[in-house]
């Protein structure tokens, strides 16, 4: 089965997708805009309807004075025990505290909770996954801002309580990626007998790519796919570039698809990395 692209034209970066029964729900980054984190719904991955936003009020997030590359970005949408979760990085004005937050709702159309901050984890692009024991793991791109100059630590994870934000384990170094720069945007999946770790690498410009690894548990150890990257438009001739930041979902016919971002080329860029 084929699907037309783009799913959404215009400014709809960092997609994350969830299949719930016959319905698909997709959330995007919204950065400094409120209402934020738009939620679209579809039954066929072709026809989509905007059904609401995660962020609709000041009690959830304050965006006044936020820079264009600040605000909220790289959300993940998941469902566990009948409750929908969206986790996302929230960055305030320059110098103000930021963090990874979790919002919940009984339906993706909302209303969504005021949210909680996960205390003690430093990074961006959070993901949520539940293992066979019901434990919740937050994977993220480790990024320490405390020194004034961000220090990157690759893909990391920790066991958390998603309802309180409490961190229940030490931070674990998951994966350094497949060899491109700055692994980020992780997503964990249990498929069959393996766990899979999907990531974005290569920076968010022309070198953007999607890579994958697999292992026996949500904490690895991880075996990088020999054909990484599994998706990229790294070139000087593709009409759509910067392709990456993917999330996997099962299609109506039982196959698999990936949603990702892409940019039509215009002017100069930071090139490859």
Where are these regions (language model features)?
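Carbohydrate-active catalytic/glycan-binding domains of CAZyme proteins
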Residues: 1-273
């Amino acid at each position: 089965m084929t699907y037309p692209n783009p799913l959404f034209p215009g400014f709809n970066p960092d997609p994350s997708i969830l299949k719930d029964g016959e319905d698909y729900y997709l959330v995007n980054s919204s950065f400094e805009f409120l209402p934020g984190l738009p939620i679209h719904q579809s039954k066929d991955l072709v026809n989509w309807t905007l059904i609401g936003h995660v962020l609709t009020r000041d009690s959830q997030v304050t965006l006044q004075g936020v820079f264009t590359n600040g605000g909220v970005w790289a959300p993940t949408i998941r469902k566990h025990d009948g409750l929908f979760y969206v986790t996302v990085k929230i960055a305030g004005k320059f110098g103000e505290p930021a963090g990874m937050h979790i919002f919940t709702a009984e339906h993706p159309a909302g209303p969504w909770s005021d949210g909680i901050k996960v205390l003690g984890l430093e990074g961006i692009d959070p993901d949520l996954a539940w293992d066979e024991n019901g434990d919740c793991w937050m994977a993220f791109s480790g990024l320490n801002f405390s020194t004034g100059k961000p220090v990157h630590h690759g893909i990391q994870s920790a066991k958390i309580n998603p309802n309180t934000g409490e961190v229940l384990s030490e931070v674990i170094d998951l994966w350094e990626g497949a060899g491109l720069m700055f692994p980020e945007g992780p997503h964990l999946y249990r498929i069959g007998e393996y766990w899979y770790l999907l990531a974005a690498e290569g920076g968010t410009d022309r070198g953007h790519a999607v890579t994958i690894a697999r292992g026996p548990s949500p904490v690895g150890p991880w075996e990088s796919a020999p054909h990484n990257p599994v998706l990229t438009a790294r070139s000087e001739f593709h009409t759509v570039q910067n392709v990456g930041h993917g999330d996997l979902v099962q299609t109506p016919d039982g196959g698999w698809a990936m949603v990702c971002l892409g940019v039509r080329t215009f002017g100069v860029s930071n090139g490859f990395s």
